[in-house]
């Protein structure tokens, strides 16, 4: 948080990156805002650099070929975007699943970037990391964006209890929810977090009409776990809700977890079989990617 000259407290949030135009984060062309920080540690995470905040350990500074990173007298790492060539050497070097390129931004600063794309987008999607860690920030941001005539979607891992605090749902069009596993043991192993809040959110979002899409990853060699999750989700969601079944791909997964999950990607025909099962059970908008 920051104080303005008039002593008004301003909300800030750690932003990993902002993609001006995306056609894979909800309906239409959208600006996607990725916040830093996530309470999960999913084995299959493709962007683990968004999990933790930078500790300023300094490991990345010497590795930067563009000299875009430095440390001040207190040891804090600073990123110079004007020098950065986006090679991501710093991210590959970081031993803490973090990034030195995170910006602490106010709602006004985020809006300024959204407005540049406003004539060409249908709305914004907030993601991460886990964007709901910044709940108060989202409420203000969404209120301002909707005043521009744009829509707002949340991409969430389901860790935030929407039923306990539904305020953000009142200012957004819907949620794209990850349901990664329903079997307790597999869930604990896969995401290092209990599944209870996720499944509670599935019911809550359906009940209030705010569930836009559910996403599940299909893993090779995990027939029972895949089927259990697909059956559970398909039996719950409504016809109007999209169900995205994502084929596991090892590219981008941390090496230490590739050995646990396997080095083969999920076969297309294998995945399509689960999509067909989901459609038979009522999830008419099930599809694979």
Model-predicted regions and their roles:
Residues 82-83, 103-111:
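FAD-binding FR-type
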Residues 2-27, 220-289:
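Auxiliary Fe-S-binding modules of radical SAM enzymes
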Residues 15-59, 76-86:
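N-terminal pre-triad scaffold of radical SAM enzymes
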